[in-house]
Amino acid sequence: KQCSDFQSKWRMITYFHGEHTGVCHGIALSMCYGNQGYIDFDDITSGAHDYWTLGSPYENSKMKDMILYYQMTQCLDSGRSTYGISKNSGWGNGDLETFLKKFVAEAQYAKRVKKPFVFSFMIPEGGHSGVACGYKKDTDGNHEITIYDENSYHPGSYGGYLTMKVSSDFKSFHF
């Protein structure tokens, strides 16, 4: 069976880093780039006009290559986070309030210009990426950010929307 260069590279990454950890980042990033017009869906699947009409990556090698390509970009210096925070050392490399202010500001901007963005997190067992695609302020002044989880972090789960609620004082958040 023939394989693409991207599939070969992905197998190498899997070999060097242990078991395959998924492609959520590649899916989320390709969804955002597609939404912003950087990907011509018709080049991937003839007649496709949006992400949902591309079909299954299991049956479409061009779509699978696209997802794997964007998945691998997180390994590049240019593909790293624009900002982040770590809870490991008491929110270590930045305080939670500053992080949440930046995150809410980015969600507000994304809503205004209609350009969703990738939201990623890491936990000791791995990490996950989704698409931050909505924002509103509730009646108490708290911030609600809608995140599309394209395949969910938990095994056997399906895609869906969840809401990240950030307190009005930016000192806490919950889902």
Go through each PLM region and give its residues.
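Histidine (H) residue identity feature
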Residues: H17-H20, H25, H49, H128, ...
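Generic structural signal for short, solvent-exposed loop/turn connectors between secondary structure elements
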Residues: M12-H17, T21, G34-D40, M122-G130, ...
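Active-site-adjacent substructure of cysteine-protease-like catalytic cores
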Residues: S89-Y148
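Phenylalanine-focused residue identity feature
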Residues: F6, F16, F41, F99, ...
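Context-gated lysine
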Residues: K1, K9, K62-K64, K87, ...
